[in-house]
């Protein structure tokens, strides 16, 4: 089993027209942290995962997963 945590952070951020900086300020982290999360270079702490889910008003499992998310686009 892979230890990677997959997320939809970039997708949700783009849907709402948010910059990394704006999202980072809203949840109290450095904007670089958002980039690290989006690229999978860093896994969010439970506290940060909960803050991000609350900000986007989605369940944590809609934002983060142990399994890759299915593509939203059909091939």
Region locations from a protein language model:
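Alpha-helical residues within the helix-turn-helix
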Residues: 14, 25, 54
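DNA major-groove recognition helix of helix-turn-helix/homeodomain DNA-binding modules
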Residues: 47-62
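Short, charged recognition helix plus adjacent turn
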Residues: 54, 64-75
């Amino acid at each position: 089993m892979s230890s990677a945590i997959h997320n939809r952070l970039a997708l949700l951020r783009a849907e709402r027209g948010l910059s990394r900086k704006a999202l980072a300020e809203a949840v109290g982290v450095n904007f670089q942290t958002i980039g690290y999360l989006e690229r999978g270079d860093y896994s969010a702490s439970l506290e940060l995962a909960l803050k991000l889910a609350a900000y986007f008003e989605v369940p944590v499992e809609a934002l983060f997963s142990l399994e890759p998310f299915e593509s939203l686009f059909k091939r």
